[in-house]
Amino acid sequence: MSAEANKALVRRWFAELDKRNLAIINELIPEDYLDHNPPLPDLPPGREGVRESSVRLLAAFPDAVHIINDQMAEGDKVMTRLTTRATFLGPIFGFPPSGKTVEVSGIAVHRVVEGQLVEHWAHLDMVGFMEQITPSVVPDESP
């Protein structure tokens, strides 16, 4: 596939997730998918890990949307700089939902082989994300 076709495939992946079309996982993610930075702990490997993380993340952030800010491709790799925006409506990482809108920026790199996303690296602003989902604590300043 060409670099442009690979970029289109990654855009389709995010667009289908935004539509809550989890059937896309069977189409675009092979059983032996390799995620170098899984989004959640204790996930099974491969396609099943992608499915489980998608279900868990959508339970916490059911209206999540991915905004593609920039995209580059070379060879079989596609780099996507994106922003994910969602409302925190379900528990995650042990934190109760706040109902607040959260936003996290990051970079995802996918390796594309024969029309499938076979490998993934991600670097997200997890500090900013955690600051948005953790309850605010105001320190007691009394003497």
Tell me the role of every PLM-derived stretch.
Residues 1-143:
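C-terminal and inter-domain tail/linker signature
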